[in-house]
Amino acid sequence: MAEPLPPWVLQVVDERPPEPGAAREWVYRALERVLRDGRLAPGSRLPAARRLAQSWGLPRGAIDQACDRLRAEGVLVRRVGDGSYVADRLPLGMASGPEPVVAPVPKRAAQKVLQRMSSRLQGARPSQHWAEGRAPRALRAGVPDIDHFPLATWRRCIAHAFADEQRSSLSYGPPQGTRELRQATARYLTLTRGMRCSAEQVIIVNSTLQATELIAQVLLSPGDRVCIEDPSHPSSARLLSLAHLDVVGVPFDEQGLDVRQAREHSPRPAAIYLQPLHQYPTGIVTSEARRRELLDWADASRAWIIEVDFLNEIAHGGAVQAPLQCGPLSEQVLFVGTYTGVMFPAIRLAYLVVPPGLVDAFSSVRGMLGDHSPVAPQQALAEFIDAGHLGDHLRAMRSTYRARRDVLQRALRGRLPAAFRLGPMVGGVSACLHLPAPWSDVAVVESLGARGVEAGALSLHGWSVPGLNGLVLGYGAYESTDIEAAVDELVALLAGVRVGEPQPA
């Protein structure tokens, strides 16, 4: 006669019924609970998998897979001919007993911590760029189209990187990045930007922010003044400030950074941070005259130029300027770019091009920090570039992005008073809609969210320049119908209140 099942076998079903399609995970969590609370004690025998499957109405395979996982973790042990037993000594995290309770921080202690917090963190907000498990909604900016990415081709490149003969992809990589990706990046920059740089000048990093942080560590000292376009990427100025640098926001007009005003307040900065090819979030392209002023200022002050390039591969017609790195002050230019916009965000690969004389310094510091980007994605990306797949993808996406830009322009055209001004849209996948008084961009963004539309507040992209007020609208990741529907909500909100009436809460 079969031995009766212990009570916990039925209790776990009552406590938390199995979820369809998640049988293996449910079994694992159920066994984990009874182990933690002591209902299944060390040294006790587990009922046969067949009987558990019958009692729980689950496939036998789900029981076996969950038990295999617990055996791999040292929780269960198999005795030949006698089934599975709970280990006599459980791993520390699986020991029985009540769940640990984290004592709340007393309010007074929390206040002291906040008082000690550096002023450099004032205004910092937890990143809301991605909400786990939820796709972005139109018109959120900073999101590329991933639905049209050639995933099958990318899988083949990844598979090649993990082939048996490529076991090196499982090891640590060189701090400056794999030679294959640095060579591919140098060729890519020649084709897309007209740059002339060697593979040795390329440092592979995980993001443009990591590149900026590395520049600060290698070239700048605490207290050095850094002039930055204002507004800019919301994290850039804050990151530089966290490096104990004196960060000064510089306004700009339709020609680019206001060099005259910047020189009056900061005649000799240590570095100038800007996006001359296509400024985010405003979309402004620095004019040739303003570029000459900028180079004169940098030359006179011997300032480093941190030239950041977001998605300049996506140009919507017209002549594309060469980077400042191609000009007469190339020995003072640090060029920063990323693959996340042209590939997909999860790839987490970007690049930094440094002057030849600084290669050893940057590689050494990155090595000392223990930084390196994962090898396999680098090898896969190098193959993806060299085989022409990235070029093919870019050609297709330029057409898609241009069409979506046109949809946004048409959807807004003539539907708002002239006081609502749409910024230039010559490249990239976002636009800036400047708002007149008395509208508040933060309040508008909140109201749009209640209508199911996402947008960014221009004022939250600022550092020290007052009066920024606008909406940062993304269009790259959304179908035409989604863009049109979102604009309808935006127009209904903005056109529904006359200038001078109270703004929406």
Model-predicted segments: where are they?
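Active-site PLP attachment segment
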Residues: C326-A361, S373-A376
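Residue-level detector of anion-binding/catalytic polar loops
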Residues: L76, R225, D246, W304, ...
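Conserved core of the PLP fold type I
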Residues: C157-S301, E313-E331, Y401, R498, ...
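Hydrophobic residues in well-ordered beta-strands that form the structural core
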Residues: I228, G249, E307, L381, ...
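Helix-loop "lid/cap" segments that line or gate small-molecule binding pockets
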Residues: T185, Y351, Q379-A387
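AMP-binding (ANL) adenylation modules
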Residues: L460-P466
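N-terminal basic, amphipathic alpha-helical segments
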Residues: M1-A159, G357, S363, G367-P374, ...
